Amino acid sequence: MNQKQEALLGLPLTNAEREWLTDRLETLSVKESYQLSAAIMRSGRLQELVGKSRDELQATVLRMKPDVAVEAINCLMTLHDYEVCYPAGSYDALGRFFLQYESGAPRDTLPFVDLDQLGRRYEDLHPGLFIGGSYVVYPTKEPEQHYTGHNLAELDDSDWSVRLKIASPEKPEGVWVRLPDYSMVNDDKADEVELALLDLKVDTIQDCTLLDARCILPEVENLVSEYHELADLIYDGNDLGFLLDEQGQGMPHFNEKFHAALAYEKCTRLGAALDIAQNLRCYDFVPREDVESFAEKFLESRGIEAGHVSLLSECMDRESYRRYLLAQQGYQQHAASGSFIRRNQLDFCYERSQPPTPQAHFEMKL
């Protein structure tokens, strides 16, 4: 570590670091709490983060030294490197888990397998920790260190779609769920929702109450009031997660276009956001990186020779002309990204939301 890094780590925690750590620790899902416990047991450090109430966590973060904060943030950024196997609270159960979900062997193999021995061999090949009725597999290599002590704003904590806090009569204070839940695409292998239900001591989502909900899309507000059924919110939260994973199946500038479309439509509801994501073809889009050359490309599209376009560009107010063309063609600027967007004439398919009234659509276009 060089002198500059040592000096940075010697400074008190910034407000941003405290807020990041407090929020991340307060919203840990049940699955993530298993992963964090395994990470801490593996390293033998950060014991102060385990088993704390909200107030205790805040006090812990306030007392935290900068070098510990850096380690804690890096640990929290790499929880996904720890695989949670459930149910697998014993060697016998771990062997059964492997046989059912990972081996590919037919079901009629089960009576002939020594599950305890299989579980122990699995542990030999995949070192980990038994915790909470699960087996958490350690990463095969040291997790990448994302945080250096001064790049908090650059950290990419975006591998989620919706966070839910759900409660049960047995646990009225509730637990967090971090969507998407991948059980449906992983042969029903237990994931976020099932682990939360286990902790809440209930059998189904219908036995739970929604206490809080947060969406990764800053445009989307008040999920609790938008959804009357928790199962519907989980379904849509999963769909958003899968959609963000796919990135429009390789669509160029997907995130930039998606957020520009959300702003263009003044979208504040998750259902409408999902419809917009499925209908991005209905928007013409000029990404920020193409804005500067928009005027030149327009002139070229009119059949003007490249040499003449270059000459005109040298002798005109390019920025004013560019803005004139964009406005004339009905584009609106997305302030956050600097890109431009407009609706085209393709039919928009509404599945989770209602089309705007003619008056509302007219006002939106003004």
Name each region found by the language model.
Residues 2-112, 116-120, 134-159, 172, ...:
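Mixed-charge (acidic/basic) macromolecular-recognition segments
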Residues 161-169:
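A short beta-strand micro-motif
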Residues 310, 337-338:
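Short coil/turn segments at secondary-structure boundaries
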Residues 123-124, 130-132, 319-329, 334-336, ...:
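Short, surface-exposed polybasic-aromatic patches that bind anionic ligands, especially phosphate groups
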Residues 114, 317, 352-366:
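Non-Sec secretion/translocation targeting segments of pathogen effectors
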Residues 137-138, 340-342:
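Generic recognition of long tandem-repeat/solenoid scaffolds
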